[in-house]
Amino acid sequence: MLVRHILSLVFVTAGLAACRGGTDRTNGGDSPPPARASVDKDTEFGHEGLYTMELSLPDLPSKADPLRATIDRYVDRQKRAFMDSLDAPGARERARELPWDLNLDIAVASRTDRFINVQVDGSAFTGAAHPAAIVDSFTYDVQAHRVIGIRELFADPHGAEKAFAAEARRQLLTALDDQDEPLASDSEQIDAGTEPGKDHFRVFSLLTGPDNKVHGLTFIFPPYQVASYAAGPQAVDVPSDAFLTYLKPEYRGAFR
C-alpha cells in the first residue's frame, strides 16, 4: 500500500543534513526514497572564511551525459545565486559573524531501463533565521536521451495533475488529524500548494518495482508549500493506477 511519508529536515549550523545511503526505492516502502551519492563530498571554503560550499554528485553512466550536463548547469546556477547574495549590503559583515553555507547532495534515487531519477537535497544559509531548503529532481529518459519534466510524461498533463492533487490532498488532509503527530498545516495551505497548473508537482521520484517498472510517483513538496517550515518537506505517494490513462503512449510500457 502506498502511503504518505514525511521527510524530516534536520538543520545544523552547516545547513541541511541530507538523506544518504540505501537502495533504490521499491513499491510499498515505508520511508522516502534514499538518495545515493557515490562520490565524496567536495568542500570549498571561501575567502576570509565567509562561506562554505559542500557538494556531492552521483556517478552516472556515459549514456546519461545530457543528464550530467543538466546537473552541472544547475549546480553552477545555485553557486552563482549563493555568491551573488554575498554582494548584498551588509552581507559580508553578517557572514563574518556567522559563516554562510551552501550544501548540495545530488544523488540517484531510483532507476529503471527507461528512467534515471536524481534527487537534490540541500540547503543554503545566507544569514536568515534558518537555512533555506533546496529540493529538486531530474528525470532522464534513457531512450530519448533527454531530461524530462513531469508534464512531458502525459498526453493530458492537466488531467494527470488533477489526479495528483486529489490524492495529495486526501493524504495531507488526513495527516492534519493524526493523533500522534498532526501535520502543521491547514486545508487552505494544502489546497493552494497542490493546485494543478501551478508547477506544484515539479519535484518527484519514481516508485519502482522488482519488474523494473514504475509503480507510482512520489511528489515532494518543499517547506512552506503545503505545510509549515517546521514540518519539513512533505512527500506523497501516488500509485500509477491513478494516472495511467493520462500517460503518453510511448511511456505506458514503462509503468505498471
Where are the model-predicted features located?
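Bacterial N-terminal signal peptides that target proteins for export
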Residues: 1-7
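C-terminal motif of bacterial Sec signal peptides marking the signal peptidase cleavage site
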Residues: 16-18
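Compositionally biased intrinsically disordered regions enriched in Thr/Gly
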Residues: 20-256
